[in-house]
Amino acid sequence: MRGLLPFLFLLSFFLSPIQAQPEGREEELEETWSEDRDQAPPRVVEESEVVGAENEAGLAAGRSYPWIILKKCRERGGQCHSGVCSWNEKFIGFCSFARPCCRKRRAVP
């Protein structure tokens, strides 16, 4: 009997009509939608323009983006891995969260 009471309460809660918005609010949303449709379509932007603008803004703000970090890792002679570096590799830095930059260890003469 104890298990039945919470079940009935939840059942009545989910079956009761719930009004999230007043009726007048729906009409306002429909009007806004029709106004948005009348606007001109957005301009198609080249991907290179976006990447260039983001890169310039990021460098000005001092942020590093994944492709910049990957390039730095490769310049150091490393490669980005998932998880951890293997036993025969040396940790150089991080490419991103839980992605270390590793390079092969040099053989000791």
From Swiss-Prot:
Give start-end of the signal peptide.
Answer: 1-20
Phosphoprotein listed as a keyword: no
UniProt lists compositionally biased (Basic and acidic residues) regions at 34-44
**UniProt keywords, alphabetically:** Antibiotic, Antimicrobial, Cleavage on pair of basic residues, Defensin, Disulfide bond, Secreted, Signal
GO BP annotations, alphabetical order: defense response to bacterium
Q: Which GO terms describe its cellular component?
A: extracellular region
For this protein, the record's InterPro entries field holds: Defensin_beta-like
Q: Quote the tissue specificity entry.
A: Highly expressed in kidney, and expressed at lower levels in testis.
Tagged with keyword Nucleotide-binding = no
**Annotated localization:** Secreted
Q: Which residues are annotated as pro-peptide in the record?
A: 21-70, 107-109
The cysteines joined by S-S bonds are: C73-C101, C80-C95, C85-C102
Q: For the region Disordered, give the residue spans.
A: 21-44
Please state the protein's primary subcellular location.
secreted
* Family, as annotated: Belongs to the beta-defensin family.
Describe the task this protein carries out.
Answer: Has antimicrobial activity.
Per its record, how is this protein called by name? Defensin-B5
